[in-house]
């Protein structure tokens, strides 16, 4: 993309560079360019788009009413608003099984948030998907993941095996590190119920994890690993979820990382009350953007 073409030399160089970096499809888009130059670019690009294609052009600026400079940030904002997130069903090898997940990456993602749900839930949970959509809108990638296979979910011992769940979460994190589109993105965890304990335990063993959010979680089940966690951690609990709230207060006192405990008034364990899940999603988005964008994961 350019503000216009004259000789087209810089666009040819850009197209060739994109090919050298492995681009499978190169599209050139300009508001104006000489017809002959556009035809020549057809040999370098898969598609060439132009609003105006005069036979000759002396200066690009003559085709503009206002040829003032446009900041790169403004261009990125426009492209980001217009682009759709990529969505992919994935399979991750871990502990001799294959875990199924849904990976969504918005353009210019700030990082990838891996979801660890609790017992009785799944990656298809409407609550998890609602939070994921809010994170995607905030330029955060999401991996909704089932940490157990369908057969394992019937085994209550595995459902509450925090060590196993944490190991699976760590395997998914390593898998993201091998993908071209996620390898350079920082990682964060969003855990619910027992999934929060798995997220904290996995983060305790991996200082590269930048941030954690627990929704109605059981961080107490992470035990002694709580004091080892370095990632900034946000604990969100419903004000009417009395037992879990007390467990979170106890867990918060064991954390040595930067952390906050936020209570959502009127909310019960599943945040089913009107507007309460939206509050969780907004808090999570702000927490992740703050710590992923700042690059200050461990403190």
PLM features per residue range, with description:
Residues 21-86:
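PRPP-dependent phosphoribosyltransferase catalytic core
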Residues 180-193:
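Alpha/beta-hydrolase fold nucleophile elbow
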Residues 229, 235-237:
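Short beta-strand/loop motif that positions the catalytic acidic residue
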Residues 255-270:
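Catalytic histidine neighborhood in serine/cysteine hydrolases
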Residues 92-182, 270-275, 279:
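Serine-hydrolase catalytic machinery in alpha/beta-hydrolase-like enzymes
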Residues 242-247:
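Conserved alpha/beta-hydrolase "acid-adjacent" motif
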Residues 9, 190-203:
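Glycine-rich nucleophile elbow surrounding the catalytic serine of serine-hydrolase chemistry
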Residues 267-270, 275-299:
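Catalytic active-site module of serine/aspartate enzymes centered on a nucleophile-bearing elbow/loop
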């Amino acid at each position: 993309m350019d503000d216009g073409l004259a000789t087209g030399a810089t666009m040819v160089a850009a197209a060739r560079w994109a090919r050298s970096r492995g681009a499978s499809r190169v599209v050139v888009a300009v508001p104006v360019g000489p017809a002959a130059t556009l035809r020549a670019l057809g040999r370098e690009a898969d598609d060439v788009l132009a609003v105006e294609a005069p036979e000759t052009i002396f200066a690009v600026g003559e085709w503009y009413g206002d040829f003032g400079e446009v900041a790169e940030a403004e261009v990125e904002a426009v492209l980001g608003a217009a682009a759709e997130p990529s969505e992919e069903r994935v399979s991750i090898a871990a502990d001799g099984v294959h875990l199924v997940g849904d990976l969504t990456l918005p353009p210019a993602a700030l990082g990838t948030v891996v979801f660890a749900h609790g017992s009785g839930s799944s990656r298809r949970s409407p609550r998890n998907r609602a939070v994921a959509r809010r994170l995607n809108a905030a330029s955060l990638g999401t991996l909704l993941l089932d940490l157990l296979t369908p057969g394992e979910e019937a085994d209550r011992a595995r459902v509450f095996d925090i060590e196993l769940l944490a190991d699976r979460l760590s395997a998914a994190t390593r898998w993201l590190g091998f993908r071209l589109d996620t390898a350079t993105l920082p990682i964060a965890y969003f855990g619910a119920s027992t999934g929060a304990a798995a997220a904290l335990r996995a983060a305790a063993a991996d200082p590269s994890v930048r941030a954690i959010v627990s929704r109605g979680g059981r961080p107490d089940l992470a035990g002694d690993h709580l004091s080892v966690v370095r990632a900034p951690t946000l604990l969100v609990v419903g004000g009417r979820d009395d037992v879990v709230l007390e467990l979170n207060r106890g867990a918060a006192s064991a954390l040595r990382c930067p952390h906050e405990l936020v209570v959502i008034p009127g909310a019960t364990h599943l945040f089913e009350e009107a507007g309460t899940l939206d509050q969780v999603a907004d808090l999570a988005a702000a927490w992740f953007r703050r710590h992923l964008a700042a690059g200050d994961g461990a403190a």
